[in-house]
Amino acid sequence: MRELFIETQEKEPEIKIPLPRVGITNLRTIAKINWKGRVYTFIPTFEITIDLPREKKGIHMSRLVESITDAMSEAIEEEVKKIHTSLEELALAVIQRLEEKHRHKRAEVWIRTTLILEKMTPASNKLSYEPYDVEVGVIKEGDKIKKTLKVKVIGNTACPHAMANNEGKTHIQRAIGELEVTTDFNEYVTLEDMIEVVESSFSSPTYTLLKTPDENSVVRRMYENPKFVEDVAREILIKAKKKFPGKIHVKVVSNESIHKHDVIAEAWA
């Protein structure tokens, strides 16, 4: 005999107020993405939310988890080439599975992970694997689908003010540049292109691997290309506006080497 369960979530709440975002966060799992013919494996962190109407006490949390699991199970090795070709396509696949399991008007899926890219060192031309924090979000409301892509890139800056007033000597510091692009789902925007826009805007990029000639090259480049954090933010913004459609947000933080505080520059377009 089939056991009957009480659907507490379907009951009316004492306080009848609609909630625009209810769901799960900090869920870690595995994902496989086929990007330009290569299969990448990620251990991403998911956040998935839907709207909750005023007459419902709660949402069915397990159905949200099932939607992620179903989308993951499709991406077996022999089939991954046919489906998830980007993190945003994976996020949309989760929403599509959720539509089969749970009624809602609005759904969001956010995926945070680390993207590892191959770079060549500037002088010795050796291979270096560089990590970048990235986040992708897909929001579906009715027939409208938007996506947001975010990248966080580490570079460095050399202070032009100290250089101008100290016979060419200056202080340098690590800087963190963030770029966020929000646009229609079908617009072509890649995380790799966004990373390149940010990384090329610093005094110099940073590298995981540096041999002595590479270290010398990075130092020379910094001193030949001094920039305020404001310069970096403006350069990222103008490059991003030319390259990417949609709304753009730029944030740069300089971890100051001669101060006890940091410096920030931020802009929107």
Swiss-Prot record:
| Biological pathway | Cofactor biosynthesis; 5,6,7,8-tetrahydromethanopterin biosynthesis
Name any one GO molecular function. Answer: iron ion binding
Instruction: Tell me the cofactors it needs.
Output: Fe(2+)
Please indicate which superkingdom the organism of origin belongs to: Archaea
What is its EC class? hydrolase
What are the EC numbers? Answer: 3.5.4.39
List the InterPro entries hit by this protein, alphabetically.
Answer: GTP_cyclohydrolase_FolE2/MptA, GTP_cyclohydrolase_MptA
**Example GO biological process:** tetrahydromethanopterin biosynthetic process
Alphabetized, the UniProt keywords read: Hydrolase, Iron, Metal-binding
Q: Where is this site: May be catalytically important?
A: 159
Q: How is the cofactor bound?
A: Binds 1 Fe(2+) ion per subunit.
- Keyword Zinc on entry: no
Q: Which reaction does it catalyse?
A: GTP + H2O = 7,8-dihydroneopterin 2',3'-cyclic phosphate + formate + diphosphate + H(+)
Recorded hits in NCBIfam families, A to Z, give: PRK13675.1-1
Question: What subunit structure does UniProt give?
Answer: Homodimer.
Q: Which family does it belong to?
A: Belongs to the GTP cyclohydrolase IV family.
- Record function comment: Converts GTP to 7,8-dihydro-D-neopterin 2',3'-cyclic phosphate, the first intermediate in the biosynthesis of coenzyme methanopterin.
What name does UniProt use for this protein?
GTP cyclohydrolase MptA
Q: Which organism is it from?
A: Pyrococcus horikoshii (strain ATCC 700860 / DSM 12428 / JCM 9974 / NBRC 100139 / OT-3)
Q: Which gene encodes it?
A: mptA
